[in-house]
Amino acid sequence: MEKGMDVLHDFGIQSTHYLQVNYQDSQDWFILVSVIADLRNAFYVLFPIWFHLREAVGIKLLWVAVIGDWLNLVFKWILFGQRPYWWVMDTDYYSNTSVPLIKQFPVTCETGPGSPSGHAMGTAGVYYVMVTSTLSIFRGRKRPTYRFRCLNILLWLGFWAVQLNVCLSRIYLAAHFPHQVVAGVLSGIAVAETFRHIQSIYNASLKKYFLITFFLFSFAIGFYLLLKGLGVDLLWTLEKARRWCERPEWVHIDTTPFASLLKNVGTLFGLGVTLNSSMYRESCKGKLSKWFPFRLSCIVVSLILLHLFDSLKPPSQTELIFYTLSFCKSAAVPLASVSLIPYCLARVFDQPDKKSL
């Protein structure tokens, strides 16, 4: 088994080396793709856009992103996947030959296990939701037309082009092996397809959100403690990252498994509180909710404020404080974009009507 994995890992190293040698001019492009594919953009950019255009799509997108990333964490703890940038330095596979030279980049040194790829899984799930939802909107109940078939082909070509670029980016940056990105894409699609058949997420109560959030958090912590009690160190990758990363400043605490867990449960809890709040009902369910200028204003203001909010980084000196603030920050994203911003804008748009009276 170990020899088979070594051969698979060697193929990945050779793939990374080939891309880095033959596509040096594409370095900036691959880094940009990796940054855009970060799941944070689903929360801070795609969610507010889709929520205010099609509320149901926005809700499904957030659920797929959160549950997909949570499953990714569990899979990583089970599969113990290596990462190219440390495996190539740590393995005995090249004891009789020269070690392939693999470059590292500021976005290379993630601290969690490598399989499956979180970037590939998150991008596949989120973009699958957007493509299938867009096709569903344009198709409606009518018989498919020639234009719809063309749109269908274009969207799926775009979808697979995005997945290919994300996969190549993660391989180029030595963050993942090829089999890990393929597993990520397939897993992301599976999660998104599952949520196409789940309708209860659109009218879930605050109690249900709380119970699901509690389950996700307690299961992950319980699973971690169980394996730790059995002598399995699930934080083994932190030592690998700190040891083999080219520059210490490239190792970020916000890429650790627990940081991912707190962000996910915080986002889902924030969505539950928001969708069951009076501010949401007064603004997003009020008379202005169907007025396009109002919805467009909500999108623009949300994107601007969330961009500024995202630039605020929790202090990372103390892990407990960092994780707590990460939870609060993630919960504030849906709270701001779904209830607070629309509520304030609704008050602004209502002012002229009140003055005319």
Curated annotation (Swiss-Prot):
One of its GO terms (cellular component) is membrane. It comes from the Eukaryota. It holds the Pfam family PAP2. It is found in: Endoplasmic reticulum membrane. A motif (Prevents secretion from ER) lies at residues 354-357. One of its GO terms (molecular function) is glucose-6-phosphatase activity. Signal peptide: none annotated. InterPro entries: Glucose-6-phosphatase, P_Acid_Pase_2/haloperoxi_sf, P_Acid_Pase_2/haloperoxidase. It is a multi-pass membrane protein. SUPFAM superfamilies: Acid phosphatase/Vanadium-dependent haloperoxidase (SSF48317). The active site is at H119, H176. Glycans are attached at N96. Keywords: Disease variant, Endoplasmic reticulum, Gluconeogenesis, Glycoprotein, Hydrolase, Membrane, Transmembrane, Transmembrane helix. Pathway: Carbohydrate biosynthesis; gluconeogenesis. Residues 50-60, 139-147, 192-209, 276-291, 342-357 are cytoplasmic. Its EC number is 3.1.3.9. It catalyses: D-glucose 6-phosphate + H2O = D-glucose + phosphate. It is an enzyme of class 3 (hydrolase). Belongs to the glucose-6-phosphatase family. Hydrolyzes glucose-6-phosphate to glucose in the endoplasmic reticulum. Forms with the glucose-6-phosphate transporter (SLC37A4/G6PT) the complex responsible for glucose production in the terminal step of glycogenolysis and gluconeogenesis. Hence, it is the key enzyme in homeostatic regulation of blood glucose levels. It is linked to Defects in G6PC1 are the cause of glycogen storage disease Ia (GSD-Ia); also known as von Gierke disease. GSD-Ia is characterized by hypoglycemia and hepatomegaly. This is Glucose-6-phosphatase catalytic subunit 1. The gene is G6PC1.
